[in-house]
Amino acid sequence: MSDKLNKGVVICATGSWYDVLTEGGAVCKCRIRGRMRLKGVRSTNPVVVGDEVLFTAEGDDFVIEELVPRRNYIIRRASNLSKESHIIASNIDRAMLVVTLSSPRTAPEFVDRFLITCEASIYEKRVYWKA
């Protein structure tokens, strides 16, 4: 790869490392450019699984330079009770939830939260009940 911008999709986010699936089918281990962390993002994680990104090769390293605008995302309040949010995933085409009726019993409120979260921006959603 050269210094030109390459496009890919984040398939794994672990700490400061991101696995990016390229348009050619290769997987590159990337880091994000430092200035991306400081762009006024009110999220605990600036890059999430599902994000389409533009990245460059710098020697043997790959660096995410920018995010392509997200079509949708699932978000929650950050666990540290700050005013920040935590984006769980982005650019979601469909969401499925498999729940059990017993052993262990799935709380109906959990299904409600799933459906409400998906209602805003995910067009295809399904719930499967396993008896």
Q: What label would you give each PLM region?
A:
Residues 98-102, 126-131:
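G-domain G4 guanine-recognition motif of GTPases
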Residues 1-108:
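N-terminal accessory targeting/assembly segments
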Residues 109-119:
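Histidine-anchored nucleotide/phosphate-binding helix
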